[in-house]
Amino acid sequence: MSGIRWRLPVLVAVLATTLGLVAAPAQGASPEKQTSPAVSVAAGKVNLGYFVQWGVYGRNYHVKNIETSGSADKLTHINYAFGNVTNGGCAIGDAYADYDKYYDAASSVDGTSDTWDAGALRGSFNQLRKLKAMHPGLKVLFSFGGWTWSGGFGQAAQNPAAFAESCYNLVEDPRWADVFDGIDIDWEYPNACGLSCDTSGFSAFPTLMSALRSKFGSNNLVTAAITADGSDGGKIDAADYGGAAQYVDWYNVMSYDFFGAFDADGPTAPHSPLTSYTGIPAAGFNSDAAIQKLKSKSVPSSKLLLGIGFYGRGWTGVSQSEPGGAATGAAPGTYEAGIEDYKVLKSSCPSTGTIAGTAYAHCGSNWWSYDTPATIGGKMNYANQQGLGGAFFWELSGDTSNGELITAMDGGLN
């Protein structure tokens, strides 16, 4: 599995990091955090979306868009992506976007401008605080790691208690303790290779998650985004996900990015197949294979969320309409070659067929695969039939302005 290769903050985000890498107490405590037990999967199906930190720049996607699209009414949880993992601990990845960016009345989710008062919270954290006030049942988790920032987990695993302490102190910083209801760990990948290779060992992941659960307690959510590589001897087999399941509220199974133009010559294949199909380029690279393998490792179905991509992956130089064709490289994309948002593809390259529970499209010399409202409906039926805890998606800005895809998820789960 390729991992989510496009989790790259823009340059201004990197520069803004210098404004404050780690959290520290500041003037003015945040509103009192609710201490009622975290919402469990048993309370209803989870419909979780990732909100990306860097989306406030080039993508011009803000917390207000979650509200105006109608998505906030359909979400149960939001994962804020990402915090960094460095020097054995959790750290702020972009201080400006997170808690300093000024929102005027027109751009603020509740129509009230930020203030420059000493100790006042701004940025996406304050916008999320306001969104939660508008939707009292909505929960927000702070997600750490991701494709780009997973290299620090190896050091963190050497002293899990210190890592957990660092993360707790950051998530529960008095300035924004009321914003977050828990922590999400996106380690790509324990005891396997992602952007870098980890050699922490089979048991490192459950040891880390145990430390986090011990520190965060039962009143906070502790979750993890995990690989969907269901191949024999693949990434699911590399770490003890079964052993760690007792410590998490659920796993976000990243059942997308199985295939893409990172294999520039093809063969073309859907990046998020629900099942296998004749001619699939790699055995075990499909959602069902991952779900069944995790179940076989004694992970409860109710602790598994099916992953949906709100984007497509594509090739160019393709003459064959059906999957399995040769290509010459990555299709052009708005932000990165080989990747495009659903909101663009639905019009620029409409679906021409389906396979293995997902859609594909051949337009000109380009070939794309992505999920549509119809294929998402089928995937939600699968999630229900398998007794899964719900579903999640990467990520909010890829949907249409009226939330077509999240509406399909909500309707399918409920």
Where are these regions (language model features)?
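Secretory targeting and sorting signals
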Residues: M1-P31
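Glycan-recognition patch characteristic of GH18 chitinases/ENGases
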Residues: V39-D173
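Short, acidic/polar
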Residues: G55-A72, A156-W176, G230-G243, S287, ...
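Extracellular low-complexity, Gly/Ser/Thr-rich intrinsically disordered linkers
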Residues: G55-V56, K343-N414
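Conserved, mostly hydrophobic/aromatic
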Residues: I78, F142, I185, L212, ...
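Substrate-binding surface in catalytic domains of secreted glycosidases
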Residues: G93-T115, P190-E340
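Generic structural signal for well-ordered alpha-helices
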Residues: F125-R129, A164-V171, F202-R213, Y241, ...
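Active-site groove signature of glycoside hydrolases
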Residues: C167-T199, D257
